[in-house]
């Protein structure tokens, strides 16, 4: 039976995050926006992450699981991109979580003319071990990718050169074969953005900062 094409593919690379994974997956499956698929890429995790992913896939048909030998964060995300069928792409780290309106607010920010292809960016909350919270606000605006210097100043200056807290157009990604660069640690998100942005019709920055929760700790996503 032919599978319906979802509007959004949510890609989660998974590695050694057993204590956080259930909260992450549950937060995505609880979205008010329901037209999405969830791609969980188990990057050879040594703990029970692979089993947890399979358990969720058995309970929810929107969940698709891919198991691979450990190859690193970039390769795990690329595996998700390889299999993503949605019109749009969102990344969530497996040790973070999102509020129930996260996808809805990103999707609602897109232009009415869906033939335009670009990027929506939002702020996020950073949660610290002591329970304190720091909200990273971004100035609400629209930037044309042709203004490269302004794009870089806004993104780098506001510390939002992460793959997550964004909605990408999968048509651009597929058409231009855009991927994360393997074996690059710490810069893979920025390099992906720099490959992607020149093809975008727009860059929408929206100050919906409380929807993505980045848990500040020693990051344990795919190594």
Task: Report each predicted region and the residues it spans.
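Nucleotide-sugar donor-binding/catalytic module of glycosyltransferases
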Residues: 1-223
């Amino acid at each position: 039976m032919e599978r319906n094409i979802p509007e959004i593919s949510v890609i989660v690379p998974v590695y050694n995050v057993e204590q956080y994974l259930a909260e992450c997956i549950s937060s995505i499956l609880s979205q008010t926006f329901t037209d999405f698929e969830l791609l969980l890429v188990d990057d050879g995790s040594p703990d029970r992450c692979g089993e947890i992913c399979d358990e969720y896939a058995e309970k929810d048909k929107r969940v698709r699981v891919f198991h691979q030998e450990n190859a690193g964060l970039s390769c795990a995300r690329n595996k998700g991109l390889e299999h993503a069928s949605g019109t749009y792409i969102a990344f969530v780290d497996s040790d973070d979580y999102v509020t129930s309106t996260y996808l809805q607010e990103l999707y609602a920010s897109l232009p009415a003319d869906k033939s335009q292809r670009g990027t929506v960016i939002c702020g996020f909350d950073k949660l610290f071990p002591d329970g304190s919270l720091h909200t990273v606000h971004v100035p609400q605006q629209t930037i044309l990718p042709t203004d490269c210097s302004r794009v870089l100043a806004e993104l780098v200056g506001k510390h939002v050169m992460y793959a997550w807290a964004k909605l990408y157009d999968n048509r651009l990604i597929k058409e231009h074969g855009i991927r994360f660069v393997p074996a690059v640690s710490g810069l893979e998100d920025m390099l992906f953005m720099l490959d992607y942005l020149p093809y975008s019709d727009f860059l929408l920055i929206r100050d919906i900062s409380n929807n993505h929760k980045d848990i500040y700790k020693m990051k344990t996503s795919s190594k």
